């Protein structure tokens, strides 16, 4: 069959993404030559995360085409969250459609969603990734492909700006990332939802429409719909009407540029963190502590009870950096210590670096606090500050 322009675009996007995850390194040599070749039973495996919707069914179909041409097995993993009536049937039908396309293995997983403080959407996402990671590890898959499109990227930027701020909010979703040791990739970030719908039509692929997307609802969606659905159904179209141009593409391109900035800032912050921050969690020892060189404290800067202090930040080193790097170093260090600090708390610790005049410490979640003594900021649970 002759490929449509959108199908050719999708094939190119999937092939480029597989190259980005270094799949070319494992391609069988004969598949570089023209002709029909059978994919070996022990060939590397790529999994497509499939919900049965139009985006993931289009990705499943295109990925099978591309993987087969590269000598790579293409399977699917389908996660049933059990949050909607009939979800088991939807998952089963998605599995049948993937098998009909030639994907294999087709892995079915049941997720247990336990909503806590983060809300149901976030809990479902966490449960889904847990199952996807488990499926990748158990099957030996070298990558899991996700079907997020340009529309999803634009929605993610708006959601990020509503919930957060700064370049991280603008950066959207990365094309390739790792989670719990599994590699994930998003090949369709350059394609629109209209294009994935068209690809399903081109290939005669059936799909399921999630009712929580609100596509069939006239007027604004009620507040009990998921935030992403409301952004998709109401906010993006309203911005587009106001702006008079394709804001989906505009936001997606902004995300691509912001991600380049974010990746540089993260890289630079990691370099500074390696020089300025020491994590301390070992048993007590008699090691001397230098207030000017926090890395000398790794051997065991503790209180009398033998509990580690958590973190030490070298003020002289971090003070030489611009504010953007300082704030990032502090935030990353706290995150690695399991402390989820607010922007105001991070800024207050930064003032201990650049505007210290003997002020008291900064209270942090989980009973932690940050206190400065000479040229070192110590971040620890409150009891560990004793006798410092």
From Swiss-Prot:
Superkingdom per UniProt? Bacteria
Q: Can you state which reaction this protein catalyses?
A: cytidine(34) in tRNA(Ile2) + L-lysine + ATP = lysidine(34) in tRNA(Ile2) + AMP + diphosphate + H(+)
Report the EC number(s), separated by commas if there are several.
Answer: 6.3.4.19
Where along this sequence does the record place binding of ATP? 51-56
Listed GO MF terms: ATP binding; tRNA(Ile)-lysidine synthase activity
* UniProt subcellular location: Cytoplasm
The family database entries (Pfam families) matched by this protein are listed as: ATP_bind_3 (PF01171), TilS (PF09179)
- Keyword terms, alphabetized: ATP-binding, Cytoplasm, Ligase, Nucleotide-binding, tRNA processing
- Broad class of where this protein is predominantly found: cytoplasm
Q: Which InterPro entries match?
A: Rossmann-like_a/b/a_fold (IPR014729), TilS/TtcA_N (IPR011063), tRNA_Ile_lys_synt (IPR012094), tRNA_Ile_lys_synt_N (IPR012795), tRNA_Ile_lys_synt_subst-bd (IPR015262)
Q: What domain comment accompanies this record?
A: The N-terminal region contains the highly conserved SGGXDS motif, predicted to be a P-loop motif involved in ATP binding.
By sequence similarity, the record places it as follows: Belongs to the tRNA(Ile)-lysidine synthase family.
Please give the function described in this protein's UniProt entry: Ligates lysine onto the cytidine present at position 34 of the AUA codon-specific tRNA(Ile) that contains the anticodon CAU, in an ATP-dependent manner. Cytidine is converted to lysidine, thus changing the amino acid specificity of the tRNA from methionine to isoleucine.
Record's NCBIfam families?
Answer: lysidine_TilS_N
Query: Can you say what this protein is called?
Result: tRNA(Ile)-lysidine synthase
Native source organism of the sequence: Bifidobacterium longum (strain NCC 2705)
Encoding gene, per UniProt annotation: tilS
């Amino acid at each position: 069959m002759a490929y449509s322009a959108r199908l050719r675009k999708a094939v190119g996007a999937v092939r480029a993404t597989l190259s980005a995850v270094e799949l070319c390194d494992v391609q069988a040599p004969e598949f570089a030559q023209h002709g029909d070749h059978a994919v070996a039973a022990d060939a590397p495996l790529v999994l497509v995360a499939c919900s049965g919707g139009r985006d993931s069914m289009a990705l499943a179909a295109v990925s099978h085409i591309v993987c087969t041409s590269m000598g790579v097995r293409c399977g699917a993993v389908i996660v049933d969250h059990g949050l909607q009536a009939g979800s088991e049937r939807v998952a089963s039908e998605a599995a049948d459609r993937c098998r009909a396309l030639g994907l294999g293995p087709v892995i079915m997983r049941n997720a247990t969603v336990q909503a806590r403080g983060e809300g149901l959407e976030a809990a479902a996402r966490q449960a889904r990734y847990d199952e996807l990671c488990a499926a990748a590890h158990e099957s030996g898959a070298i990558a899991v492909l996700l079907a997020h499109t340009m529309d999803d990227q634009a929605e993610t930027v708006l959601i990020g700006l509503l919930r957060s701020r700064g370049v991280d909010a603008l950066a959207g979703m990365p094309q390739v990332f790792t989670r719990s040791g599994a590699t994930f990739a998003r090949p369709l970030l350059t394609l629109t939802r209209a294009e994935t719908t068209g690809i399903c039509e081109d290939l005669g692929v059936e799909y399921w429409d999630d009712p929580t997307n609100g596509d069939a609802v006239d007027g604004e969606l009620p507040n009990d719909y998921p935030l992403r659905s409301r952004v998709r159904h109401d906010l993006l179209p309203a911005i587009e009407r106001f702006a008079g141009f394709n804001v989906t593409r505009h936001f997606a391109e902004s995300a691509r540029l912001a991600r380049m900035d974010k990746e540089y800032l993260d890289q630079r912050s990691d370099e500074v963190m390696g020089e300025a921050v020491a994590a301390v969690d070992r048993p007590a020892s008699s090691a001397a502590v230098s207030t000017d060189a926090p890395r000398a404290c790794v051997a065991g800067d503790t209180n009398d009870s033998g509990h580690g202090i958590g973190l030490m930040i070298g003020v002289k080193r971090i003070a030489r950096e611009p504010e953007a790097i300082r704030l990032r170093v502090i935030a990353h260090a706290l995150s690695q210590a399991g402390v989820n600090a607010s922007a105001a708390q991070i800024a207050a610790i930064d003032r201990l670096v650049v505007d210290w005049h003997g002020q008291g410490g900064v209270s942090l979640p989980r009973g932690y606090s940050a206190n400065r003594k000479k040229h070192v900021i110590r971040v620890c649970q409150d009891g560990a500050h004793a006798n410092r």
